[in-house]
Amino acid sequence: MKLWGGRFVHESNSFFKKFNSSIQTDYKLVEQDIFSSMSWADALLKSGVLIKSECNEIKNALQKLLCIVKKTPNIVLDSNLEDVHSWVETQLILLVGDLGKKLHTGRSRNDQIATDLKLWCKHKIKDLFNRIIEFKIELIKISDNTQSVIMPGYTHLQRAQPITFSFWCLAYLEMIKRDEDRLKDALKRLNSSPLGCGAISGTTWNIDRENLAKSMGFKSATNNSLDSVSDRDYVVELASVASISMMHLSRFAEDLIFFNSSESKFVELSDTITSGSSLMPQKKNPDSLELIRAKSGRVFGFLVSILVVLKGLPLSYNKDMQEDKKGLFDALNTWSKCLFMSSLVLKNLHINSINCLKASKKSYSNATELADYLVNKGITFRDAHHITGQIVLEALKLNVPLEKLDLSIFKKYSSSIELDVYNFLDVISLLEKRNSKGGVAPKIVSKAIICEKKQLKI
């Protein structure tokens, strides 16, 4: 059944029908469409459009339909109808006859699709919160178990200063917590119902939109009908939240790919999330991480795509908006899968603490400590920086780490350097001194872990 056509003389071109149809994508909204239709039936009852028996008959039929699509959601795809709304209404009429034709009274597909999509987003956000929590738990578990694992921290992909693997985990935990906060904020802004706005200007029927909104689980009804049917800010915002988080997951993946490489050997990925080569028997490839890194591009692509779709649209609804769903479904599903895969990667991650420690003692990553030592001796930091650079150059020529240099070489560049310099250059001492808020000092890291475990009740 087609929901329009009375003013048309000629049938639609067959290719146009397929081109115009969205059912291959929006069939995923069938449960939301049925749910919102049941709430709409109640609203029509209260407004006098339906009597009690009619409302019950419609809702019972919709409930039967809901049970069917929950078992076989792809049943919608067996039709050649224009969209999911057409399918639900057609099935309803088959079940209750002409009574089903009353349901669309006062309602437009414009407010209907906006409502359905928001309902789907709310449901998907619950799944995303669960995935985020899973990932946070795995990060905290590894962080808790690796507080004593010293490794190099990097800037410009060069060894910079010693940190701990635990500290590295907490860095990504901070990122994912910000992602979680952004998702919470996005949920707040989409948690209003456009149902009852009609095509663009509201409805002439006495619909209590606030009560209708709450019956569907929304916090409130939207304020302006013209804006409500054309608003896709929540789609853009969710795409943005997903993109930022996927950027974080991509960096997480890149770090672990590097740590897992033959050049680093800081970690070893589990056999369960790696693959081999069809030619080279020795290979164990970090495919899980490489795919996370690659899939971020798909999510970024949708963010740009939806912005371009919306940027030139006049108020209010335009068919262009049909292009909002396929990319959104894919972006949020991709984000969810990548969060889950990231958790799987961490579950059985083996950390080679010996290799981590060896690497942290190379490349003069304790040079900053030497400069700070000189500052403690009364030398300005800029002069201390220059003196330390000269000493590092000497150590490079001798191929000796700073902590192994003879005291006479230190004194060659500054008479202020005494035997106590060796305590300053010790990697454990170095970590303990970084005890400012957010620092790598073991007591600071331990306190952060305890706090996070308490919040997540683990």
UniProtKB/Swiss-Prot annotation:
EC number(s) from the headed UniProt entry: 4.3.2.1
Signal peptide: none
Gene Ontology cellular-component annotations: cytosol
Alphabetized PROSITE patterns for the sequence: FUMARATE_LYASES
Compartments where found: Cytoplasm
Pathway the protein acts in: Amino-acid biosynthesis; L-arginine biosynthesis; L-arginine from L-ornithine and carbamoyl phosphate: step 3/3
A family per Pfam: Lyase_1
Keywords for the protein's UniProt record, in alphabetical order: Amino-acid biosynthesis, Arginine biosynthesis, Cytoplasm, Lyase
Gene Ontology biological process terms, A to Z: arginine biosynthetic process via ornithine; L-arginine biosynthetic process
Reactions listed under catalytic activity: 2-(N(omega)-L-arginino)succinate = fumarate + L-arginine
Main enzyme class: lyase
Disulfide feature: none
GO terms for MF: argininosuccinate lyase activity
Coiled coil: none
Family per record: Belongs to the lyase 1 family. Argininosuccinate lyase subfamily.
Protein name: Argininosuccinate lyase
Species the sequence originates in: Buchnera aphidicola subsp. Baizongia pistaciae (strain Bp)
